[in-house]
UniProtKB/Swiss-Prot annotation:
Signal peptide: none annotated. It comes from Dinoroseobacter shibae (strain DSM 16493 / NCIMB 14021 / DFL 12). The lineage of its organism: Bacteria, Pseudomonadati, Pseudomonadota, Alphaproteobacteria, Rhodobacterales. ATP binds at residues 30-33, 51, 87-91, 415, 496. The gene is groEL. This is Chaperonin GroEL. It holds the Pfam family Cpn60_TCP1.
Amino acid sequence: MAAKDVKFDIDARNRMLKGVNILADAVKVTLGPKGRNVVLDKSFGAPRITKDGVSVAKEIELEDKFENMGAQMVKEVASRTNDEAGDGTTTATVLAQAIVKEGMKSVAAGMNPMDLKRGIDLATSKVVEAIKSAARPVNDSAEVAQVGTISANGESEIGQQIADAMQKVGNEGVITVEENKGLETETDVVEGMQFDRGYLSPYFVTNPDKMTTELEDAIILLHEKKLSSLQPMVPLLESVIQSGKPLLIIAEDVEGEALATLVVNKLRGGLKIAAVKAPGFGDRRKAMLQDIAILTGGQVISEDLGMKLESVTIDMLGSAKRVSITKDETTIVDGAGAKAEIEARVAQIRNQIEETTSDYDREKLQERVAKLAGGVAVIRVGGMTEVEVKERKDRVDDALNATRAAVQEGIVVGGGVALIQAAKHLDGLEGANNDQNIGINIVRKALEAPLRQIAENAGVDGSVVAGKIRESSDLAFGFNAQTEEYGDMFKFGVIDPAKVVRTALQDAASIAGLLITTEAMVADKPAKEGAGAGGGMPDMGGMGGMM
């Protein structure tokens, strides 16, 4: 086992804080409408330019192992916020840095770290309550566009595209983002269906960068039972190979020998294939398989109907223009099903919605209608160069996630103002002791950090802006960094999804609390140069006389 390097107390915390600051300082320059770009070097291809906080965070790896631990913990804040809310990663990073900085100062001054953490947790839950109660629902398409615009760093075209897409497929519909070959960004609505089952093996992945499986012009086998052996399917698989088209298997499960055989065939390149579990459970699974069959123009292979795998022919399978599979979701786009049959199926499900008395069943049936009728909207992002397209696609992804979050939990005042207004709810909050009160004050101070950073990125003194907003009794009063004006943020259209603001604070406080309470750090000692050359023969001199 390699020797370990151990750091304690102040030395450990200082090293960690340095790492936190390096990562946060690189990420926070992107915050706000006047945030700057960060250029990321790639080992192959052109450098990538981005304003996406989590993309910047993911690239950072520090040489000093102790500093790197601090950086990796804050990277975790950005990643978690991105996974939960899809946006707000830079805000979360700025909040985490502010809490850690103040917390470390207090620990160095002799405060109890555990009490500080308890104070931070108390304050965070109080502020989260305030954000939730301040949220109001999204009223119309214009507000959806405003949320998207803010998240896309002020580009109104992106906000409008997302609002249009949401209008076309509804809030239940599925929206995906792709790169366009041309200069324009356009929105297409394609008939399609998405369900929450991912690939059964990562070996099916065709795009390792995104860890997705993309099948173009695919054939789809729908099987109601488990597949544990492929022997009955051999004639069918031979027909599929002859057709040259990729195959998607949707079954209750594909396990053991069957899965191993598919993976081996995929790796050898003989068969373009992927397998996913069927969505739903019990009777609902049967119904959803039937939905997919109607959408793709195929049949469900069911033993109840006397169908055996041995007798299945290729014309009994469904087909779709494109299938995209991630580890969690499968999207079938442009199925070959007849329009009249799809409409009849939708009408049938709508009748069931009217008849059902269970709220849960009604919700699930409505989801099925959305998947059959709503389709998939595809936003194709264009640009002059590949670098520009990738940068814009990052922003469209963020904006899309933000608008979804806004529809889920409502909107609050944007530009960091919601956090400052929520801080007023901490005024009467008392901890069990003085150290906990200091923890509460750490959060109170940290809540101003995003607004200050937005102002500073716009070239304005952050403390002056924060002071003005703190003094105002109008909850919507704020600073529009785009126009450098003070006023009603709702009228300016500067709004944030409540879910994004809430998640950013919760994740930041959670990780910052862990960092503050760290007392020791352990890392591998760096290997000494030339240590790998041991065991060779010593001096070889004097062997010349052996001839």
